[in-house]
Design a protein with these regions (language model features):
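A hydrophobic alpha-helical transmembrane-helix feature that marks the membrane cores
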Residues: 1-207
Length: 207
Protein backbone atom coordinates (compact mmCIF):
# COMPACT_ATOMS: atom_id res chain seq x y z
CA UNK A 1 0.00 0.00 0.00
CA UNK A 2 1.52 3.39 -1.00
CA UNK A 3 2.42 5.83 1.75
CA UNK A 4 0.85 9.28 2.08
CA UNK A 5 3.90 10.92 0.52
CA UNK A 6 3.75 8.47 -2.38
CA UNK A 7 0.07 9.29 -2.92
CA UNK A 8 0.70 13.03 -2.83
CA UNK A 9 3.65 12.75 -5.22
CA UNK A 10 1.74 10.56 -7.67
CA UNK A 11 -1.24 12.93 -7.61
CA UNK A 12 0.68 16.23 -7.36
CA UNK A 13 -0.66 17.66 -10.64
CA UNK A 14 -4.19 16.46 -9.85
CA UNK A 15 -4.07 18.01 -6.36
CA UNK A 16 -2.75 21.29 -7.77
CA UNK A 17 -5.68 21.42 -10.21
CA UNK A 18 -8.16 20.55 -7.44
CA UNK A 19 -7.05 23.38 -5.17
CA UNK A 20 -6.59 25.87 -8.02
CA UNK A 21 -10.14 25.25 -9.20
CA UNK A 22 -11.44 25.30 -5.63
CA UNK A 23 -9.86 28.73 -5.12
CA UNK A 24 -11.38 30.05 -8.35
CA UNK A 25 -14.89 28.79 -7.56
CA UNK A 26 -14.87 30.04 -3.97
CA UNK A 27 -13.61 33.41 -5.20
CA UNK A 28 -16.51 33.63 -7.67
CA UNK A 29 -19.08 32.90 -4.95
CA UNK A 30 -17.50 35.30 -2.46
CA UNK A 31 -17.18 38.11 -5.00
CA UNK A 32 -20.81 37.71 -6.10
CA UNK A 33 -22.02 37.62 -2.49
CA UNK A 34 -20.08 40.74 -1.46
CA UNK A 35 -20.72 42.93 -4.51
CA UNK A 36 -24.32 42.00 -5.37
CA UNK A 37 -26.90 44.14 -3.57
CA UNK A 38 -29.91 42.00 -4.44
CA UNK A 39 -30.20 38.72 -6.31
CA UNK A 40 -31.98 39.13 -9.69
CA UNK A 41 -33.09 35.49 -9.48
CA UNK A 42 -35.46 34.04 -6.89
CA UNK A 43 -34.22 31.63 -4.23
CA UNK A 44 -36.10 28.58 -5.53
CA UNK A 45 -35.04 29.22 -9.13
CA UNK A 46 -31.43 29.36 -7.97
CA UNK A 47 -31.86 26.10 -6.08
CA UNK A 48 -33.37 24.46 -9.16
CA UNK A 49 -30.45 25.59 -11.34
CA UNK A 50 -27.96 24.30 -8.78
CA UNK A 51 -29.63 20.88 -8.52
CA UNK A 52 -29.67 20.50 -12.31
CA UNK A 53 -25.98 21.42 -12.56
CA UNK A 54 -25.02 18.93 -9.82
CA UNK A 55 -26.94 16.15 -11.61
CA UNK A 56 -25.31 16.98 -14.96
CA UNK A 57 -21.83 17.11 -13.44
CA UNK A 58 -22.39 13.79 -11.67
CA UNK A 59 -23.95 11.83 -14.53
CA UNK A 60 -23.13 13.39 -17.91
CA UNK A 61 -19.89 12.34 -19.67
CA UNK A 62 -18.73 15.85 -20.62
CA UNK A 63 -15.17 17.21 -21.00
CA UNK A 64 -13.36 19.01 -18.19
CA UNK A 65 -13.71 22.44 -19.83
CA UNK A 66 -17.51 22.07 -20.00
CA UNK A 67 -17.54 20.89 -16.38
CA UNK A 68 -15.50 23.93 -15.40
CA UNK A 69 -18.00 26.26 -17.09
CA UNK A 70 -20.94 24.54 -15.37
CA UNK A 71 -19.13 24.64 -12.03
CA UNK A 72 -18.49 28.36 -12.51
CA UNK A 73 -22.20 28.94 -13.20
CA UNK A 74 -23.01 26.95 -10.06
CA UNK A 75 -20.58 29.07 -8.04
CA UNK A 76 -22.16 32.24 -9.43
CA UNK A 77 -25.68 31.11 -8.52
CA UNK A 78 -24.56 30.01 -5.06
CA UNK A 79 -23.01 33.43 -4.55
CA UNK A 80 -26.40 34.93 -5.41
CA UNK A 81 -28.01 32.59 -2.86
CA UNK A 82 -25.65 33.93 -0.20
CA UNK A 83 -26.66 37.55 -0.86
CA UNK A 84 -29.78 37.17 1.32
CA UNK A 85 -27.62 36.51 4.37
CA UNK A 86 -26.20 40.04 4.15
CA UNK A 87 -29.67 41.28 5.08
CA UNK A 88 -29.78 39.33 8.35
CA UNK A 89 -26.14 39.44 9.51
CA UNK A 90 -23.58 42.23 9.59
CA UNK A 91 -20.20 42.31 7.86
CA UNK A 92 -18.41 41.37 11.06
CA UNK A 93 -20.43 38.15 11.35
CA UNK A 94 -19.63 37.29 7.71
CA UNK A 95 -15.93 37.92 8.35
CA UNK A 96 -16.01 35.66 11.42
CA UNK A 97 -17.83 32.95 9.43
CA UNK A 98 -15.23 33.12 6.63
CA UNK A 99 -12.33 32.80 9.08
CA UNK A 100 -14.11 30.04 10.99
CA UNK A 101 -14.82 28.12 7.80
CA UNK A 102 -11.22 28.31 6.57
CA UNK A 103 -9.90 27.33 10.01
CA UNK A 104 -12.23 24.33 10.26
CA UNK A 105 -11.40 23.30 6.69
CA UNK A 106 -7.67 23.32 7.42
CA UNK A 107 -8.17 21.50 10.73
CA UNK A 108 -10.43 18.76 9.35
CA UNK A 109 -8.26 18.28 6.27
CA UNK A 110 -5.38 17.75 8.69
CA UNK A 111 -7.47 15.18 10.57
CA UNK A 112 -8.15 13.31 7.33
CA UNK A 113 -4.44 13.24 6.49
CA UNK A 114 -3.53 12.19 10.05
CA UNK A 115 -5.95 9.26 9.86
CA UNK A 116 -4.25 8.09 6.67
CA UNK A 117 -0.87 8.34 8.40
CA UNK A 118 -2.31 6.25 11.22
CA UNK A 119 -3.50 3.61 8.77
CA UNK A 120 -7.19 4.47 9.19
CA UNK A 121 -9.18 4.68 5.96
CA UNK A 122 -12.80 5.83 5.94
CA UNK A 123 -14.55 3.57 3.46
CA UNK A 124 -17.86 3.42 1.65
CA UNK A 125 -19.76 2.54 4.81
CA UNK A 126 -18.71 5.81 6.43
CA UNK A 127 -19.64 7.67 3.24
CA UNK A 128 -23.10 6.08 3.32
CA UNK A 129 -23.49 7.11 6.96
CA UNK A 130 -22.68 10.72 6.04
CA UNK A 131 -25.10 10.66 3.10
CA UNK A 132 -28.07 9.37 5.11
CA UNK A 133 -27.23 11.74 7.95
CA UNK A 134 -27.27 14.64 5.49
CA UNK A 135 -30.59 13.49 4.05
CA UNK A 136 -32.10 13.32 7.55
CA UNK A 137 -30.68 16.75 8.37
CA UNK A 138 -32.29 18.27 5.25
CA UNK A 139 -35.68 16.76 6.15
CA UNK A 140 -35.48 18.08 9.72
CA UNK A 141 -34.40 21.52 8.46
CA UNK A 142 -37.47 21.67 6.21
CA UNK A 143 -39.65 20.77 9.20
CA UNK A 144 -37.94 23.49 11.28
CA UNK A 145 -38.52 26.08 8.53
CA UNK A 146 -42.22 25.38 8.01
CA UNK A 147 -43.01 24.70 11.67
CA UNK A 148 -43.85 27.38 14.21
CA UNK A 149 -42.00 27.74 17.50
CA UNK A 150 -39.13 25.48 16.41
CA UNK A 151 -36.28 27.99 16.77
CA UNK A 152 -34.48 25.74 19.26
CA UNK A 153 -34.63 22.83 16.80
CA UNK A 154 -33.20 25.12 14.11
CA UNK A 155 -30.25 26.04 16.37
CA UNK A 156 -29.58 22.38 17.16
CA UNK A 157 -29.70 21.46 13.47
CA UNK A 158 -27.29 24.27 12.64
CA UNK A 159 -24.81 22.87 15.16
CA UNK A 160 -25.31 19.36 13.75
CA UNK A 161 -24.72 20.76 10.25
CA UNK A 162 -21.37 22.22 11.32
CA UNK A 163 -20.30 18.85 12.70
CA UNK A 164 -21.59 16.92 9.68
CA UNK A 165 -19.86 19.05 7.04
CA UNK A 166 -16.66 19.02 9.11
CA UNK A 167 -16.82 15.21 8.96
CA UNK A 168 -17.42 15.45 5.21
CA UNK A 169 -14.15 17.38 4.85
CA UNK A 170 -12.31 14.55 6.62
CA UNK A 171 -13.97 11.95 4.39
CA UNK A 172 -13.48 13.88 1.14
CA UNK A 173 -9.82 14.51 1.99
CA UNK A 174 -9.26 10.77 2.21
CA UNK A 175 -11.24 10.18 -0.99
CA UNK A 176 -9.28 12.80 -2.93
CA UNK A 177 -5.96 11.37 -1.78
CA UNK A 178 -6.74 7.68 -2.21
CA UNK A 179 -9.44 7.35 -4.88
CA UNK A 180 -8.71 7.22 -8.60
CA UNK A 181 -10.64 10.13 -10.12
CA UNK A 182 -9.20 9.41 -13.59
CA UNK A 183 -8.07 13.04 -13.79
CA UNK A 184 -11.52 14.44 -12.95
CA UNK A 185 -10.33 17.27 -10.73
CA UNK A 186 -13.64 19.11 -11.18
CA UNK A 187 -15.60 16.49 -9.23
CA UNK A 188 -12.96 16.39 -6.50
CA UNK A 189 -12.92 20.17 -6.09
CA UNK A 190 -16.75 20.23 -6.18
CA UNK A 191 -16.80 17.91 -3.15
CA UNK A 192 -14.58 20.31 -1.20
CA UNK A 193 -16.53 23.32 -2.47
CA UNK A 194 -19.86 21.95 -1.23
CA UNK A 195 -18.32 21.10 2.15
CA UNK A 196 -16.92 24.61 2.55
CA UNK A 197 -19.95 26.64 1.43
CA UNK A 198 -22.37 24.56 3.51
CA UNK A 199 -20.10 24.89 6.52
CA UNK A 200 -19.98 28.64 5.88
CA UNK A 201 -23.79 28.89 5.71
CA UNK A 202 -24.19 27.01 8.98
CA UNK A 203 -21.62 29.23 10.69
CA UNK A 204 -23.42 32.37 9.47
CA UNK A 205 -26.76 31.09 10.73
CA UNK A 206 -25.13 30.12 14.03
CA UNK A 207 -23.91 33.71 14.43
Amino acid sequence: MPTLLDLMYQKRVFLLLVFANLFIQLSISYYVMIYTKKSPIGHWYLLGIQIIIIIVLALAPIPSFAKFILFSIFSYTFGLSLVEYKEIVDERAIEIAVKGTLSLFGLMMGVGISLILGGIRLGQRFGSFLFWSLLLLIILQIIAIVGDGLSMLHKVLTFVGIILFSMYIVYDTQQILSRDYAGDFISASMAYYLDIVNLFVNLIVDN
